[in-house]
Amino acid sequence: MVVIMLNYDDIKIIDEIYSEGYLFAQYGIYIKKKFKQKIFKIPVDIGLGCPHKKNGGCIFCPEMGRPISVKYCSAKIPLKEQIKKQMENQKKKGFKKFYIYFYPGTNTYAPAEKLKEIWDFSLSYKEVIGLSIGTRPDCLEKEKLDILAEYVENGYDIWIDLGVQSMHQKTLEILNRGHDVSDIIKAIKDCHKRGIKVCGHVILGLPGESWKEMMETAKILSLLEIEAVKIYPLVVVKGTKLEEMYWKGEYRTLDENQYISLVCDFLEHLSPYVLIQRLSKDKVPESIKVSPEWYLGRLKIMNKVSEILKKRGTKQGARFFR
């Protein structure tokens, strides 16, 4: 039985994507069909940091957080300016409607009143159709979700970009994530009760995690009716505990072929109705990247994944039912 939370119109759109020959449910195509136009996500940094840093943080995250290289996306720039400048630039490229994407960091790590001010302001632009908010599973208190639920009731498309990484407790402890699998499950269910959509971020190639466990993560997220996923390879960057493990020979990153093969396997074990927002990372600055050496470009990875799935004669969801 296929597990889905999407409505009938969304299901029709995804079925149409497959009928056109695509081998996985590409989010960009889905959005274009749903809204009859492309929608641009404006990334903004509101400088909220991460509550887990005081506990040492995750082993893959540097002390100061991951740098991003998007022009006009910086906590040093007022939010109004970040939105205005990026919106102006994207309008020149033909975009008319936008999501505001709160990234990086834990973007619910602030009092509810402050967050409401930020979210209200972001939605005050007539061109903005919704929000996408990156956060941790243990930082989604009821009062904050209730505010987001009001936006849903008013017709906005609200997404939580949730740092899942893995659905295995052992792995979360190795990563020093600072939360349990139960927190992930609760966060997803709490969002769904309010009509808030969830995009789970998943990392493949985590220390100590087996192929079977990675595939179980795909199936569990499907059974939790998650709407979308972003899939990433684990990247070793300077100034992290993971870097120490790497130089000691305690961890090795996946090579390109290993990663692409795992992505294909993961997609096969995922419900065909989970949207795929990403299959790789943004470019990691060479100044801080330790490993892997291969190019992480999203378009390249997406094309190679499509090529391998085609060679296998398979597609997303092919092994979800087994």
From Swiss-Prot:
InterPro entries in UniProt: ELP3, Elp3/MiaA/NifB-like_rSAM, Radical_SAM_C, rSAM, rSAM_horseshoe, YhcC-like
SUPFAM superfamilies, A to Z: Radical SAM enzymes
S-S bonds: none
Co-factor binding comment: Binds 1 [4Fe-4S] cluster. The cluster is coordinated with 3 cysteines and an exchangeable S-adenosyl-L-methionine.
Domain Radical SAM core: residue ranges: 34-286
GO molecular function, one term: catalytic activity
Superkingdom classification of source: Archaea
Pfam family, one: Radical_SAM
Iron recorded as keyword: yes
Family: Belongs to the radical SAM superfamily.
Protein name: Uncharacterized protein MJ0486
